[in-house]
A protein has these predicted regions:
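Long, intrinsically disordered low-complexity tandem-repeat segments
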Residues: 106-116
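Conserved catalytic-core motifs of GNAT/GCN5-like acyltransferases
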Residues: 22, 63-65, 83-99, 115
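Conserved active-site tyrosine of GNAT-family acetyltransferases
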Residues: 77, 82, 101
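Short glycine/proline-centered loop/turn elements that form peptide/ligand docking sites
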Residues: 47, 69-73, 90-95
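Short amphipathic helical patch at the helix-1/turn junction of helix-turn-helix
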Residues: 33, 67-68
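Acetyl-CoA-dependent GNAT
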Residues: 1-40, 44-57, 86, 104-105, ...
Length: 119
């Protein structure tokens, strides 16, 4: 069962992150931010909230797939501690490959502690 985290500004939704927990792993399924709200930390805040919440309930690893051609998203995830560990050939409907990226528990715990201190 997937869970949804939503970022709001005033009463308006400006972004979301969907993730699914399987055993001790959290799988980031989708991240979207209103184009007018990009580069303002919305995706970073959503990702930090997911990692904090899931680490607190026992997640040890996070993983996601990202389009091989999506250079901006790949850089974003790398900057948040995710590491490319593999490739899923022809993963997307158009035949494009996906990069598999993961983040381990040590980094997730560190990020959760930093988020707790800054709130």
């Amino acid at each position: 069962e997937a869970r949804l985290w939503v970022a709001k500004e005033e009463a308006r939704s400006i972004g979301f992150l969907a993730a699914r927990r399987i055993a001790d792993e959290v799988h980031v399924l989708s991240v979207a931010v209103d184009p007018e709200q990009r580069r303002r930390g919305v995706a970073s805040s959503l990702l930090a909230a997911v990692l904090r919440d899931e680490t607190a309930s026992g997640a040890r690893t996070a993983l996601l797939e990202v389009r091989a051609s999506n250079v901006a998203a790949r850089a974003f995830y790398a900057n948040t501690g995710f590491v490319a560990v593999g490739r899923r050939s022809r993963y997307y409907a158009n035949g494009e490959d996906a990069l598999l990226m993961t983040k381990d528990a040590l980094l997730m715990t560190k990020d959760a502690l930093l988020m707790t201190r800054s709130t």
